[in-house]
């Protein structure tokens, strides 16, 4: 498959075969995620982060450098010319003359799509508001493939927390629809998965459960995908306080789950997963975070036309 110069904006843009192709390349690159290679020697990737990020920004930075490339960019809007009034469009037009690819995180939904329509080099969406986060989804699927005893198509996946504002769960739901996985959505009423996504999944013929009770789904879940409540997306702090701390996984919570059930989280966590869970056999969120490096190495090498 040819991904050279292709933009990575949304999981909706990919077929199952294309996703599997990316994950297969990630598996081949995983050994190099610690020791490195030189296939991107001389290449420059711009990482433009208008919102705070730890894992995504640093794992992209690591991925580029493990491939032998270098990075330029900024880690907040405050350190860019945005503070002087420069538009995103103008920034993209400038940066695409400096770099061979652009990794963009922006608070505005649709920003990455707009950037891709302007840029002369591949744009990789590292999160656009409450929209999409495709490389997070790819590493989530890679984690399920590596850590679960079942194939992705046979999994029961419980997605828990902020399903309204959480872009990671939007992207993940679309991707899991390609595999026919069974999905359970657990959230407070005011943070339910958007109706447009539910309707999309139903048209795909997926088995979907919506509930506000975590206990309803724990017994049958192969994957418990926890998310934090997206405080920064709430227009009213009082509304956030009403739902903060709604769901929390503890060792006691996990007493009734299957022996092979895994707990995932895109991180950062607040209080959704007790620290004591880290030592249990179910915890996979730190390994999940590491998998971001080989997956992003795979994405970068593909869009930049590097043969591995």
Swiss-Prot record:
EC number: 2.1.3.2
Cellular component per GO, a single term: cytosol
GO terms for MF: amino acid binding; aspartate carbamoyltransferase activity
Pathway where it operates: Pyrimidine metabolism; UMP biosynthesis via de novo pathway; (S)-dihydroorotate from bicarbonate: step 2/3
Reactions the enzyme catalyzes: carbamoyl phosphate + L-aspartate = N-carbamoyl-L-aspartate + phosphate + H(+)
This protein's UniProt keywords: Pyrimidine biosynthesis, Transferase
Protein name stated in the entry: Aspartate carbamoyltransferase catalytic subunit
Family: Belongs to the aspartate/ornithine carbamoyltransferase superfamily. ATCase family.
Binding site for carbamoyl phosphate: 55-56, 105, 133, 136, 267-268
Gene assigned in the entry: pyrB
Enzyme category, top tier: transferase
Gene Ontology terms describing biological process: 'de novo' pyrimidine nucleobase biosynthetic process; 'de novo' UMP biosynthetic process; amino acid metabolic process
InterPro entries associated with the record: Asp/Orn_carbamoyltranf_P-bd, Asp/Orn_carbamoylTrfase, Asp/Orn_carbamoylTrfase_sf, Asp_carbamoyltransf, Asp_carbamoyltransf_Asp/Orn-bd
Superkingdom in the source lineage: Archaea
Annotated binding of L-aspartate, by residue: 84, 167, 228
Its biological purpose: Catalyzes the condensation of carbamoyl phosphate and aspartate to form carbamoyl aspartate and inorganic phosphate, the committed step in the de novo pyrimidine nucleotide biosynthesis pathway.
Alphabetized Pfam families for the sequence: OTCace (PF00185), OTCace_N (PF02729)
Assembly mode: Heterooligomer of catalytic and regulatory chains.
PROSITE patterns according to UniProt: CARBAMOYLTRANSFERASE
